């Protein structure tokens, strides 16, 4: 990288500089495009390539995985390709990408959002390991598997697992390193969103993590007793009172979703009123 930077600084009129070398039995090409340093490995077909490494300048908050570099279509992201790019916040992965290597986005400390296009079938082991600010991940319906520790330590993660996913690896979601002992522990107030009866629900149950099917839950049943009644309304009012007086809230993410009947992202007296209306309707057989 230092040699490449020296070459770039010496040729000011050139916006893209390339160098080639042999590695992994594939031709390696390094180039700079719009101040971003890329290294690719050309596949045997002579048309496609794997993105081996990427260095994004500190000024780059958003990045899109290129569809083409040096005339080659990029079809894969290699192991650790984006790892350690500490300033990038948003990454978009296009439909041309068919595979991703392990640890590809590991320790991207400022990463908050990732968007996948349809085409990816697997998120490998440690793919987003230790991305503490990662919150939004838009997964494609083509996805089949999520590898071991794929989102380990992603404490802010809030995403929905498509029903197409049939296998989820160990510690893939909702887990982080235990603070006072060896091993892993469930992230506080973590919630897995998925489909009832799917691999995501199975994973949540096995690991003691809250689960919700966003298309199939009992609205208002915040105490999880399989009925929406006055007890739920009382719980919602108690939560609202805490929030209003500055006392720490006690509802989990799951309870906040279930208790927010009017969809304004706030659990308050309006929601309690709607819960009571549901209870009254159910009680009278309406």
Task: Please state what every model-predicted region is.
Residues 199-208:
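Short, aromatic/basic amphipathic alpha-helical patches
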Residues 40-46, 58-76, 86-99, 108-122, ...:
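Structural signature of tandem-repeat unit edges
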Residues 107, 119, 130, 142, ...:
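Ser/Thr/Pro-rich low-complexity tandem-repeat tracts
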Residues 14, 18-41:
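Low-complexity, acidic Ser/Thr/Pro-rich repeat tracts that form intrinsically disordered stalk/linker regions
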Residues 79-81, 101-104, 124-127, 147-150, ...:
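Consensus positions within tandem repeat domains that build extended binding/scaffold surfaces
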Residues 32-55, 210:
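GGW-centered surface loops in extracellular recognition modules
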Residues 1-21:
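Sec-dependent N-terminal signal peptides of Gram-positive bacterial secreted proteins and lipoproteins
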Residues 18-21, 215-286:
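Cellulosome-associated attachment modules in secreted, modular CAZymes
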């Amino acid at each position: 990288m230092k040699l490449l930077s020296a070459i770039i600084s010496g040729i000011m009129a050139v916006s893209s500089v390339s160098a080639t070398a042999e590695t992994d039995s594939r031709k390696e090409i390094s180039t700079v495009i719009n101040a971003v340093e890329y290294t690719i490995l050309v596949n045997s077909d002579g048309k496609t390539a794997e993105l081996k490494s990427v260095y994004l300048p500190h000024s780059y908050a958003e990045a899109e995985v290129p569809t083409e570099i040096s005339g080659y279509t990029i079809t894969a992201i290699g192991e650790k390709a984006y790892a350690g790019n500490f300033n990038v916040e948003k990454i978009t992965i296009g439909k041309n990408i068919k595979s991703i290597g392990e640890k590809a986005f590991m320790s991207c400390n400022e990463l908050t959002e990732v968007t996948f296009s349809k085409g990816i079938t697997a998120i490998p082991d440690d793919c987003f390991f230790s991305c503490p600010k990662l919150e939004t991940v838009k997964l494609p319906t083509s996805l089949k598997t999520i590898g071991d520790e794929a989102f380990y330590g992603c404490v802010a993660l809030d995403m929905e697992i498509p029903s197409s996913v049939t296998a989820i690896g160990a510690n893939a979601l909702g887990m982080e390193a235990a603070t006072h002992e060896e091993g892993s522990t469930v992230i506080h107030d973590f919630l897995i969103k998925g489909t009832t009866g799917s691999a995501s629900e199975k994973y949540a149950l096995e690991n003691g993590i809250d689960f919700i099917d966003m298309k199939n839950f009992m609205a208002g049943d915040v105490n999880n007793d399989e009925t929406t009644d006055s007890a739920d309304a009382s719980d919602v009012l108690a939560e609202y009172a805490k929030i209003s007086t500055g006392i720490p809230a006690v509802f989990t993410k799951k309870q906040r979703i279930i208790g927010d009947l009017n969809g304004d992202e706030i659990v308050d007296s309006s929601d309690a009123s709607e819960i009571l209306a549901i209870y009254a309707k159910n009680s009278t057989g309406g």
